[in-house]
């Protein structure tokens, strides 16, 4: 039913997020709008990838977005959304989230919450994801 209440706090716990990648070297697919990359392991010591991992998207609006991979309906570290172009779908509850324009809002399924969103800063060919 997706009654997304935009004022609700995400049930995904706040844990450290600090992750940097080089677009060309680490994720060349992020040079094409509509593409994304899922990060489930830190790439080096001192990198933190949130609760269930990071979903980094290059939106159709030419901006970068990042979300926690954990489904906010299931809120379990091991239940991660799977991405197909501009939608991320939970394999457990079937909720579908819009990631193509960075909202993370649920547009189909049971989740009352959007995906937990993180901040992305681009500097040259580097992307940095923080809380």
Task: Put a short name on every predicted segment.
Residues 1-2:
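Sec-dependent bacterial lipoprotein signal peptides
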Residues 5-84, 116-131:
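N-terminal pre-ligand scaffold of iron-sulfur
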Residues 73-109:
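Surface-exposed, polar helix/loop patches in the mature regions of secreted/periplasmic/lumenal proteins
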């Amino acid at each position: 039913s997706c009654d997304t209440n935009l004022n609700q706090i995400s049930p995904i716990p706040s844990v450290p997020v600090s992750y940097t990648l080089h677009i060309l070297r680490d994720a060349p697919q992020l040079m094409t709008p509509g593409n994304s990359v899922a990060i489930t392991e830190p790439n080096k010591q001192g990198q933190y990838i949130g609760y269930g991992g990071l979903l980094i998207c290059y939106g159709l609006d030419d901006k970068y977005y990042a979300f926690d991979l954990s489904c906010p309906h299931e809120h379990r570290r091991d239940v991660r959304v799977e991405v197909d172009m501009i939608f991320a779908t939970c394999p457990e509850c079937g909720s579908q989230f819009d990631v193509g324009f960075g909202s993370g809002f649920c547009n189909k399924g049971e989740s009352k919450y959007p995906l937990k969103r993180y901040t992305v800063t681009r500097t040259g060919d580097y992307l940095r994801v923080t809380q």
